[in-house]
């Protein structure tokens, strides 16, 4: 049995994919007999026992204008908790304050893995398009990560690209450290069986339901959802766009939808997992407009629910869908509206089955087993370290 610790910032009540991935992988590690601890930021210091392991919250301030996300600055407290837990392996889902714990782990002969949850080059381009020497700065930051950790885990080829480019441009060989390990999906909880006819009528009357689950921040490009709704209105496609999520752009988006009288409903962040499962299964199409998604867990949950997906052709979701269960398109609202209209002329039952079948190729158990194999963690392979 191994003791595996996973540390992360930006993990909280509204974290979405990161929180789901960490909790789900931890649960599979636990099912396989390992001890797991998650260390994350919180409103106060708190230790909670969960079915998937121990969650240690370290008191941390809220990042201004982030919509409630927190970041841990007291890394000594994190180190204290790690010493008490005595991990055999340390997983890191952070490029900022917590990355320095990789140095501590190295002094303790603890192997480490860094998870590339985002394309930092794309995030910087979205928020700081005119920043000088962007590529050099990003390469420097990524090189520091590569030097600090034993493994770099990307969920898709798209997520791995900036590290592959770093290896190529600097004549480095990161292949021994870099691995592709897709995420999974809860195929029991997310199912076409959750489709709810009463819910369909309640949220869209007799209109087709377009569903989007996203964070309302610049890098997710939520404004494009309203462009699509406007284009559907112009071409006469009778739809109701239901948007689940929250973030710093909420007021701006709501104001625009009201001003333009768009067929859009904002339902906020969905914390009820059962309600989310019903929404995903009741929707006719799932719209994933984020241009720089490195996996797209919500899109995979939609497929598991039997709901086809339209995504941006620049994101990693193109690696998740195929032509039988989804479409990838550029940022052109008229083309999205046309595809939406044409989609409803197709065999919806067959497409739903293809969507579910594609999702069944992904599982959390397989994700966890692949990671453990990569990390060379087997049953009974570790002794007490401290």
Spans of model-derived segments:
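Nucleotide-sugar donor phosphate/pyrophosphate-binding loop at the beta->alpha transition
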Residues: 111, 122-144, 168, 191
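Short alpha-helical donor nucleotide-sugar binding micro-motif in glycosyltransferases
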Residues: 269, 277-283
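Short hydrophobic beta-strand element within catalytic cores of glycosyltransferases
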Residues: 308-311
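Aromatic "clamp/platform" in nucleotide-sugar-dependent glycosyltransferases that forms part
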Residues: 291
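Conserved donor-binding/catalytic core segment of Leloir-type glycosyltransferases
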Residues: 202-230
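Nucleotide-activated donor-binding/catalytic signature segment of Leloir-type glycosyltransferases, i.e.
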Residues: 251-270
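A short, active-site helix/loop in glycosyltransferases that binds the activated sugar's phosphate group
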Residues: 139, 147-177, 185-189
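Conserved acidic donor-binding segment of nucleotide-sugar-dependent glycosyltransferases
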Residues: 323-334, 341-347
């Amino acid at each position: 049995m191994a003791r595996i610790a996973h540390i992360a910032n930006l993990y909280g009540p509204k974290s979405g994919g990161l929180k789901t991935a960490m909790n789900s992988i931890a649960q599979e590690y636990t099912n396989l007999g390992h001890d797991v601890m998650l260390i994350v930021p919180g409103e106060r210091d708190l230790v909670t026992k969960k079915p998937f392991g121990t969650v240690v919250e370290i008191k941390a301030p809220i990042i201004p204008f982030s919509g409630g996300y927190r970041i841990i600055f007291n890394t000594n407290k994190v180190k204290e908790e790690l010493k008490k837990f005595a991990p055999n392996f340390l997983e890191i889902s952070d490029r900022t304050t917590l990355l320095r714990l990789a140095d501590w782990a190295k002094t303790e002969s603890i192997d480490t893995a860094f998870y590339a949850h985002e394309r930092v080059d794309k995030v910087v381009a979205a928020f700081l398009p005119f920043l000088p020497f962007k590529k050099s700065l990003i390469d420097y930051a990524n090189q520091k990560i590569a030097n600090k950790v034993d493994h770099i885990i990307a969920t898709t080829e798209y997520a791995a690209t900036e590290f592959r480019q770093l290896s190529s441009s600097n004549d480095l060989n990161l292949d021994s450290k870099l691995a592709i390990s897709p995420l999974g999906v809860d195929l029991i909880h997310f199912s076409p069986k959750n489709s709810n006819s009463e819910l369909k009528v309640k949220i869209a009357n007799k209109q087709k339901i377009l569903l989007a689950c996203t964070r309302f921040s610049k890098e997710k490009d939520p404004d494009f959802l309203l462009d699509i709704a406007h284009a559907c209105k112009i071409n006469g496609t009778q739809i109701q766009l239901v948007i689940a999520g929250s973030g710093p752009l909420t007021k701006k988006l709501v104001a625009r939808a009201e001003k333009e009288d768009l067929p859009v409903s904002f339902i906020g962040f969905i914390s009820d997992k059962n309600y989310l499962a019903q929404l995903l299964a009741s929707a006719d199409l799932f719209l994933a407009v984020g241009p720089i998604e490195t996996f797209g867990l919500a899109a995979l949950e939609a497929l598991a629910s039997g709901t086809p997906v339209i995504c941006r052709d620049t994101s990693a979701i193109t690696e998740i869908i195929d032509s039988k269960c989804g479409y990838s398109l550029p940022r052109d609202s008229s083309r999205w509206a046309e595809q939406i209209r044409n989609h409803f002329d197709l065999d919806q039952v067959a497409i739903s089955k293809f969507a579910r079948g594609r999702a069944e190729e992904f599982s959390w158990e397989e994700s966890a087993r692949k990671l453990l194999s990569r990390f060379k963690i087997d049953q009974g392979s570790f002794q007490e370290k401290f």
